[in-house]
Amino acid sequence: MNYFKRKWNETRGDQYDSWGKSAWYFETDNNGEVLRQIEAYDNGKVLKYDNQNIDDEFGGLADQNLDLSEFVEFSIEKEEFENKWK
């Protein structure tokens, strides 16, 4: 498994724009398929997606593989991801 955290320095641009900027956490397999995803917003809102909870009214689990070569610099430890997933 691979774990990443990537900050998004823009707001959503939709009716939830007031949530602020966000940090996105991904758990992927070795092909870049996103297995679990967390979106953590400045206002404290946290969205979590996986195969049991694919989407909701706010968004959903990535439906495209990540290009792992583009995410190398955003690697994090499994523990950091798991602590946020709780």
Q: What are these model-derived regions, one by one?
A:
Residues 1-13:
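Short, extreme N-terminal segment that most often corresponds to the first beta-strand
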Residues 13-41:
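Short, flexible N-terminal segments of the mature chain
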Residues 37-67:
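Acidic, low-complexity, intrinsically disordered interaction modules
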Residues 56-86:
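Short, compact, well-ordered microdomains
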